[in-house]
């Protein structure tokens, strides 16, 4: 079994935020190929998580793929429909979190790809964070 090497300080910081009783939003950024995704993957092990990687495609395709990731966590094999819009998808993430014993980690990797595919997604996410997520 390979152990996670390096980034222990960052991993400890993420785990401390996870233990916080408050909503936490963390942005991880940096040059390409420096281990950001590996850090995130290590952090979400053994935690309820939705991991979504944005793609260079259309907003509709990103919404469809995000919807699949949300439905995967819900173990909803029968619901293959996409959410009507990103606001509904992001709000459903909180609905799922409300029914879990542990905090839910919601990861959007390669966010710039998602933001380029759907120009309103950043303001939608900000709205949902301010009006839905921060209530909890």
Label every PLM stretch briefly.
Residues 1-136:
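Phosphate-binding site recognition
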């Amino acid at each position: 079994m390979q152990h996670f090497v390096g980034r222990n300080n960052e991993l400890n910081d993420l785990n401390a935020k996870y233990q916080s009783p408050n909503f936490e939003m963390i942005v991880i950024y940096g040059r390409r190929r420096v281990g950001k995704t590996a850090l995130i993957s290590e952090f979400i092990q053994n935690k309820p998580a939705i991991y979504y990687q944005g793609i260079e495609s259309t907003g509709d395709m990103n919404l469809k793929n995000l919807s699949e990731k949300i439905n995967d966590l819900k173990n909803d094999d029968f619901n293959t429909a996409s959410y009507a819009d990103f606001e509904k998808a992001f709000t459903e993430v909180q609905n799922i979190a409300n029914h879990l014993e542990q905090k839910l980690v919601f990861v959007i990797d390669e966010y710039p790809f998602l933001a380029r595919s759907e120009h309103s997604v950043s303001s939608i996410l900000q709205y949902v964070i301010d009006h839905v997520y921060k209530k909890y």
